[in-house]
Amino acid sequence: MPFTRVAIPAGTSPAHKAAIARGVHEAMVAAIGIPEDDFFQLLSEYHPGDFLFDRGFLGVQRSDGVVVVQVTLRRGRSDAMKRDLYARIAANLHHAAGIRPQDVFVYLSENDFSDWSVGNGRMSMEIAMQREAGA
């Protein structure tokens, strides 16, 4: 169950927000195999001066329109899957929302199943184990 935070420039229209969210989610479904209904995203806007970055780090020329995609997910995806994810997110955001691929900054934070609670104050792993035992 990934949880995704997306930081976008202030003033992004609701239609572009929806396109960004959809583009990121579709990339995760295709590249790392998450279920279609495993959709948890938090979009937040940043204002000029709130996000400071090097415009040419590692030879990538960035503009004021940088979108930061932070995905927290369980361990276990291969480097090939991660490469595919990065490429798909950049391509989807370019096609769906007109965001330059150079302005798509993605990072992953991996953890374990026991690090999640998706509701009711219960560890998600316990809920999954209960369901498996009852099936």
Predicted segments — roles?
Residues M1-A135:
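A domain-level signal for the structural core that forms small-molecule/cofactor-binding pockets
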